[in-house]
């Protein structure tokens, strides 16, 4: 499963991960999940940090949450940037049948995430630019791409 969210949009994803944590408490290791989460500042906005660390220790989030702190450095870093950086892992999970959950603002974020996933499919799947976009559309048609966005 791939989870992606900026800011407070992470709340519904936390609930999904907590459910998985309970469901797989007796199964070792649980199926891999990747959380890509964004906020402005590590020290002020890192929501649910303790939960992500506990889930990493339990093996639910191997490597921990992938976090984009957009204001902690000169160049802004967003979740779509982190998705591209994690491209090989994202592609492997998608090819293994992962579902994608995108939660947060309905403004520019959903399109930026869709474009980042298309870039991942293009680069790591060798699909070409049009093939990458078609791959992401296919995820929607297969009901593997889920949006929970608001304005």
Regions found by a protein language model. Name each.
Residues 11-16:
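E2/UBC-UEV (E2-variant) core
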């Amino acid at each position: 499963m791939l989870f992606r969210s900026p800011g407070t949009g992470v709340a519904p994803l936390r609930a999904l991960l907590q459910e998985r944590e309970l469901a797989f408490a007796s199964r070792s290791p649980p199926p891999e999940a990747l959380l890509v989460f964004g906020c402005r500042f590590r020290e002020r906005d890192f929501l649910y940090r303790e939960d992500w660390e506990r889930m990493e220790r339990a093996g639910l989030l191997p490597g921990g949450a992938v976090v984009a702190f957009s204001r902690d450095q000169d160049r802004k870093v967003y979740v779509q940037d982190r998705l591209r950086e994690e491209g090989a892992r994202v592609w492997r999970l998608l090819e293994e049948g992962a579902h994608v959950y995108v939660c947060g603002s309905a403004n520019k974020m959903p399109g930026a995430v869709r474009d980042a996933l298309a870039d991942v499919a293009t680069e790591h799947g060798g699909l070409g630019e049009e093939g990458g976009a078609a791959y992401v559309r296919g995820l929607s048609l297969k009901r593997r791409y889920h949006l929970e966005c608001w304005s």
